Amino acid sequence: MKNQWNNILSIGEKVLNGEKITADEALTLSKSNGSDIFLLCSFANKLREKFNGNHVDLCSVINAKSGNCSEDCAFCAQSAHHKANVSCYPLLNEDKILEMAKQREAYGARHCDIATSGLGYTGDEKDFQTILKAFKKMKENTNLKLCACLGTLTEKAMNSLAAVGVERYNHNLETAKSFYKNIVSTHGYDERIKTINYAKNAKMEVCSGMIVGLGETMEQRIEHALLLRDLNVDAVPVNILNPVKGTKLENAKPLSPMEIIKTFAIIRFILPDKIIRYAGGREKNLRSLQPLGFLSGLNGMLIGNYLTTNGQSVNDDFNMLKDLELEY
């Protein structure tokens, strides 16, 4: 135990001094168990405080087009390859999207993300033009920071989003490259990375994260986090698998709450100065331990409902942040 304490403290001091940790050092941190996990989390919280202060970045998502997706992501209720009981509907019109954006601004979101099912867009589609109009109306009628989650895009499509005021693009890699083939077969990992690079070239912030609990190892979570560091993304949403009946992963074994908390902390050690965001699955998987996420290095949160599952009440989220004396 004492040796692991020393490992945590020495690696943590290295990060505090502005140095990057190695894959081997991250693996050393992952050996923390029992009370060592709380020291690991405490140091991750110290890193969050030093590099990011006490502000929590809040965002919300609009599921603007749901279901009937051509892709076969094993976790996703919206895939046409699955038999999940999920609401399916075509793209909402721009006025409906604006109405939903105003609702999210009213309940406290600072960023609003328009998300659509499907592989992505080239920039010429009628639906994509509707999305551009929706963003223009949001820019004119709200104070929200505009975000998009539209799948893989061409450079042309990405530049069109930037031109109407979209400031952040969300494109999750989902898992490590070494595990990806177990989760998706209909499009490749490099396609996703190309989209991230298009967003960076368009001078957008990039939000790219992961789902934990897909069957990956801790080593693969570390592999993924190190790649996100290399890609220099701005924000990392961490989803925890919430298995949906009818999907390939409906019977996946859930991670233990302490394994999840330890994962948050290690990601903070790897990405000390980034937004690391609570995303889907926290309510089901962590239950009463949700506040521990913010004591383990998190500094962002998706509030309200998710794409196909419900989140806890916004008031409960705000009360949690107030109790932790965090700003938002």
UniProtKB/Swiss-Prot annotation:
Protein's pathway: Cofactor biosynthesis; biotin biosynthesis; biotin from 7,8-diaminononanoate: step 2/2
GO terms classed as biological process: biotin biosynthetic process
Transmembrane residue ranges: none
PROSITE patterns found in the cross-reference section: RADICAL_SAM
Matching Pfam families: BATS, Radical_SAM
Disulfide bonds: none
Catalytic activity from the UniProt record: (4R,5S)-dethiobiotin + (sulfur carrier)-SH + 2 reduced [2Fe-2S]-[ferredoxin] + 2 S-adenosyl-L-methionine = (sulfur carrier)-H + biotin + 2 5'-deoxyadenosine + 2 L-methionine + 2 oxidized [2Fe-2S]-[ferredoxin]
EC code(s) of this entry: 2.8.1.6
SUPFAM superfamilies in the record: Radical SAM enzymes
Binding locations of [2Fe-2S] cluster: C112, C147, C207, R277
Cofactor binding summary note: Binds 1 [4Fe-4S] cluster. The cluster is coordinated with 3 cysteines and an exchangeable S-adenosyl-L-methionine. Binds 1 [2Fe-2S] cluster. The cluster is coordinated with 3 cysteines and 1 arginine.
Family annotation (SMART domains): BATS, Elp3
One Gene Ontology molecular-function label: iron ion binding
Top EC class, one word: transferase
CDD domains, A to Z: Radical_SAM
Keywords of the record: 2Fe-2S, 4Fe-4S, Biotin biosynthesis, Iron, Iron-sulfur, Metal-binding, S-adenosyl-L-methionine, Transferase
Cofactor: [4Fe-4S] cluster; [2Fe-2S] cluster
Location of the Radical SAM core domain: 51-282
Family: Belongs to the radical SAM superfamily. Biotin synthase family.
Subunit structure, as described in the record: Homodimer.
Function: Catalyzes the conversion of dethiobiotin (DTB) to biotin by the insertion of a sulfur atom into dethiobiotin via a radical-based mechanism.
Protein name: Biotin synthase
Gene giving rise to this polypeptide: bioB
